[in-house]
Amino acid sequence: MDYFTLFGLPARYQLDTQALSLRFQDLQRQYHPDKFASGSQAEQLAAVQQSATINQAWQTLRHPLMRAEYLLSLHGFDLACEQHTVRDTAFLMEQLELREELDEIEQAKDEARLESFIKRVKKMFDTRHQLMVEQLDNETWDAAADTVRKLRFLDKLRSSAEQLEEKLLDF
């Protein structure tokens, strides 16, 4: 059973996150291992396994990129295990330049420049994210997979920039 079905939700990217949260709580109550403490060993094991599956499904569906990757996996694009990478050389060059810029910001300990950098990367991420949403809605799986690969780069870059921000603020 796929994670969307487990939560009683349609298999699409845009979800009702409140319904997702409520269903998670219901499933957790229903399959919590403590409810099966007096059951047989097989029942206890099944409850632990079901609870782990529910938790994994929850983590996957509530995180936007993970949800997109999972949805793509249901359509034959297993991005988590694939060896493919972004083939867009202009995008890759831009990523290298952004990484170099982040390194320069770190060396200079320039908080104002870092703040501007983070805003720019967030805007780039948001623009690509909106494109991905449209591609998933239109079921253009190849294009959506390519966009998700690019979003991974931007997500890692954003995370690195935010870690640097914390480091500079603690300094």
Curated annotation (Swiss-Prot):
Domain annotation J: ranges: 2-74
HAMAP family (UniProt xref): HscB (MF_00682)
Family note: Belongs to the HscB family.
Keywords: Chaperone
Originating organism: Escherichia coli (strain SMS-3-5 / SECEC)
Gene Ontology MF term list: ATPase activator activity; protein-folding chaperone binding
InterPro entries: DnaJ_domain, HscB, HscB_C_sf, HscB_oligo_C, J_dom_sf
Any GO BP annotation: protein folding
Subunit structure comment from the entry: Interacts with HscA and stimulates its ATPase activity. Interacts with IscU.
Keyword Nucleotide-binding assigned: no
GO cellular component, one term: iron-sulfur cluster transfer complex
UniProt function note: Co-chaperone involved in the maturation of iron-sulfur cluster-containing proteins. Seems to help targeting proteins to be folded toward HscA.
SMART domains for this protein: DnaJ (SM00271)
Protein name: Co-chaperone protein HscB
